[in-house]
Amino acid sequence: MHCSLNGDWSMQLNSTEISDLIKQRIESFNVVSEARNEGTIVSVSDGIIRIHGLADVMQGEMIELPGGRYALALNLERDSVGAVVMGPYADLKEGMKVTGTGRILEVPVGPELLGRVVNTLGEPIDGKGPIEAKLTSPVEVIAPGVIDRQSVDQPVQTGYKSVDSMIPIGRGQRELIIGDRQTGKTAMAIDAIINQKNSGIFSIYVAIGQKASTIANVVRKLEEHGALKNTIVVVASASESAALQYLAPYAGCAMGEYFRDRGEDALIVYDDLSKQAVAYRQISLLLKRPPGREAFPGDVFYLHSRLLERAARVNAEYVERFTNGEVKGKTGSLTALPIIETQAGDVSAFVPTNVISITDGQIFLQTELFNAGVRPAVDPGISVSRVGGSAQTKIIKKLSGGIRTALAAYRELAAFAQFSSDLDEATKRQLNHGQKVTELMKQKQYAPMSVFDQALTIFAAERGYLSDIELSKVLDFEAALLSYARGQYAELAAEIDKTGAYNDEIEAQLKKLTDDFKATQTW
């Protein structure tokens, strides 16, 4: 044994080779160290988890759970973190390990989302394959400051005669649509989106806490009318967790801000913020936050104000700064149409009063009008637009001055006329005119009207062309007049649709058109 070892010199290594080999091994040794901010779930109840041992967590941070899910840190307490699970939570158990990600929730943004239906996290749910979005954006962003804003002076045409004439909406405005259930709130918002299909305005429709069947119907209607290709639909249906319903409006807003910040115009509909407030109330109560009025938490005003302040018209300097000089000389806007559902017409409840005070006006839809067949059921008495007047199309503004007054006077006189049988001629004329205008403001769903169509209709009403027409024939007269005008005065129609201008020459042409029609046509 001893001899054989001594005799085998090939086995021997000198000391320098050994030290070189050790150095090589040390140099090539790769240590992968990962610092993880880890904690343990100590309780799970109703989608709320309490986590112990998770240090350095931000408010609103994403916390990674087993199974690739996430929770959102909302309560940062001395010895635990209260988080709300985004998604199913039935299989979560006490003792499970969770990890802080160090990231705030972000959603994909960009033109790749147009024409798609996504959930709150921006994941497609329409079965049309993955979305190859190049950018993401945080869901919570501070709204542009006063210096970055520009006054609202460009119109958003909803296609509704009653809205565009009496309660005009401008790009960058927040206009609340408020009313009881089944008064046509969603119908009005969807028609406004359909009317943008050729206006260059992108649309985002955020459905919060609605039935999946209702949302599917909305998507189908948008597709049928060719508006889906310019629209992003964000869905947090009634079956989703409260966390996703609470976050959906912010996610949709981030998608809309992508267009605003790049000098484009976008319109966002929140349908509806009452359900978002209820979801937030549920989360807050489960997190043991102290309840206030109607059991809502103290910060429910801030919940909506920080969302709606992000709808704005931003100036060209802001857009240029944001795009690093790529887009010059263009202002951007995000117009918001939040929807609030009232209970038995009570606009003085907590959430409705909050949102009324945040927004730049409201369109109030009344059950009585809706049931009487006045659709859209806009109440001109308490509906206002605080900033839209300066954004109204010139021709509509010039022609529609007397519409609101006529309707308000008619409502007042109609109530008075019930008690009196012998009315003087002037009162009868006013009542007759008010009835005709009310009839004329009726409009079918999914039939938004162009600027020319609205202008001609209002012109006919204001210049007394309806005075000798039976009430039941008013809408037939309107349809025949518009059909005649599109055929015989196509150039005038195209000019008004394009420019919205109004002068003596255009007025003379409108008068000639209406006179010719009444003299030669039947309806």
UniProtKB/Swiss-Prot annotation:
Keyword Transferase part of the UniProt annotation: no
Against CDD domains, the record matches this protein to: ATP-synt_F1_alpha_C, ATP-synt_F1_alpha_N, F1-ATPase_alpha_CD
Top-level EC class as recorded in UniProt: translocase
Question: GO cellular component terms?
Answer: plasma membrane; proton-transporting ATP synthase complex
Broad class of where this protein is predominantly found? membrane
Where found, per UniProt? Answer: Cell inner membrane
Q: Does the keyword tRNA-binding apply?
A: no
Q: Where does ATP bind?
A: G179, D180, R181, Q182, T183, G184, K185, T186
Its domain of life?
Bacteria
* Entry GO MF terms: ADP binding; ATP binding; proton-transporting ATP synthase activity, rotational mechanism
Subunit record text? F-type ATPases have 2 components, CF(1) - the catalytic core - and CF(0) - the membrane proton channel. CF(1) has five subunits: alpha(3), beta(3), gamma(1), delta(1), epsilon(1). CF(0) has three main subunits: a(1), b(2) and c(9-12). The alpha and beta chains form an alternating ring which encloses part of the gamma chain. CF(1) is attached to CF(0) by a central stalk formed by the gamma and epsilon chains, while a peripheral stalk is formed by the delta and b chains.
Q: What is this protein called?
A: ATP synthase subunit alpha
Q: What is the lineage of its organism?
A: Bacteria, Pseudomonadati, Pseudomonadota, Gammaproteobacteria, Vibrionales
Supply the gene name: atpA
